[in-house]
């Protein structure tokens, strides 16, 4: 069963700018369970009277055939500001952004064991730059965290050009 993962963090002006203070993973309980709605309620219940910003996977805009609302609709309905791209960034760009941010710009609370384990154990398929998702317990937190980091701290790609002489 694929969990829905959320990494809760705050951004500061001074270094380290990102401080991850909680991670939540929820799985379907069955029936007509709306996992995104449960996540919204879980976060707002644990941290009331806060400003909520979500950085979801771009596929969250789509509604299933039986769904009345998309995941992004549910986040907005729950009072979250949503920052989502029209398409997901390339995995390598997300990974590069996270790796750059991990170089002294992030503090992760030790209780965020799922994110820490993901960061330590997620690797590429041998001989490729593609993330190995064969272990179903891994990559959920790194994916969630990666969308946030990519949006707020993107890596800037150099542009190459030619000089006319």
Whereabouts are the PLM-identified features?
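Mg2+-dependent endonuclease catalytic cores in nucleic-acid-processing enzymes, primarily RNase H-like
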Residues: 15-132, 155, 163-165
